[in-house]
Curated annotation (Swiss-Prot):
It comes from Leptospira biflexa serovar Patoc (strain Patoc 1 / ATCC 23582 / Paris). Pfam families: RecO_C (PF02565), RecO_N (PF11967). The keyword DNA repair applies. Signal peptide: none annotated. It comes from the Bacteria. Disulfide bonds: none annotated. This is DNA repair protein RecO. GO terms for biological process: DNA recombination; double-strand break repair. Involved in DNA repair and RecF pathway recombination. InterPro entries: ARFGAP/RecO, DNA_rep/recomb_RecO_N, NA-bd_OB-fold, RecO, RecO_C. Keywords: DNA damage, DNA recombination, DNA repair. Belongs to the RecO family.
Length: 249
């Protein structure tokens, strides 16, 4: 039986029976798959930490085409992001980001961009500490890549770019941009929409320089959270504790 390798971030980890654990990766090259590590929870040789959420791992697995999951030969821990996980907020951030990625990443599909986005977000947060500003950046990049959020900022009514208008609004319900020339705008989203537009074309560090005000990121994150509720039909399990802890609930 052929042995294959995959590198990725663990976005789902759950116990099976008394000693097994099932994990799922946002992988570097392969489609999203489930891997079972038999007996790892009782093993004295294999480290259970290698199946922890948010860890960067390399999995050696048996390529069993007929099964819904792959049996692992070995799981090698590459990086745990210890600096990020050493405090409560950082740990909650990892749990939130991995759950969000898991919800957006369908089984059997191949999205290496999500792996790059997730690993990059964890890496920069591990090096520089968690910043709230990364939340809307991650969500917007992930949602646009998966085709859920529009990437062109044109008014649904007149077809002109809303970024050039006096005011603009994003309707979560209809997932459309509206401009002040065509509609009365009771809540102006224009500063946030300009932030979104920049996020889609610049690195996170550059976005922070161009848009230094935290309030714009907070409002952008609120809009994207509303969008996620509409898209998923529910709140993420990790949402309440995470947002309560960072003071944005």
């Amino acid at each position: 039986m052929a042995i294959r390798k995959e590198i990725g971030i663990i976005i789902q980890s759950k116990d099976i029976g008394e000693s097994d654990r099932l994990i799922s990766l946002a992988g570097e090259t392969q489609v999203r798959m489930n891997f079972i590590s038999k007996g790892i929870r009782k093993s004295k040789r294999r480290a259970i930490i290698s199946t922890e959420l948010g860890c960067l791992v390399e999995v050696d697995y048996y390529d069993q085409v007929e099964k819904d999951w792959k049996s692992t030969k070995e799981i090698h821990l590459i990086k745990r992001y210890d600096e990020l996980k050493k405090d409560y907020v950082g740990t909650l951030f990892v749990l939130y980001l991995t759950e969000l990625t898991s919800q957006l990443y369908p089984d059997g599909e191949n999205h290496p961009f999500l792996y790059q986005l997730l690993s990059g977000s964890l890496e920069v947060s591990n090096e520089n500490g968690f910043r709230k500003e990364i939340l809307p950046f991650f969500k917007l990049r992930a949602l646009t890549h998966m085709g859920h959020f529009p990437t062109e900022f044109y008014c649904h009514t007149c077809g002109e770019e809303v970024l050039t208008k006096a005011k603009a609004y994003f309707s979560v319900d209809s997932r459309e941009f509206l401009c002040s020339d065509c509609h009365p705008i009771t809540k102006d989203h224009l500063p946030v929409l300009k932030l979104f537009h920049t996020m889609l074309s610049k690195k996170f560090s550059n976005v922070l320089v161009i848009f230094p005000k935290e309030a714009e990121y907070r409002e952008g994150d609120m809009i994207l959270n509303q969008f996620l509720r509409s898209l998923l039909g529910r709140e993420l399990k990790s949402y309440f504790e995470f947002y309560k802890t960072i003071g944005d609930l």
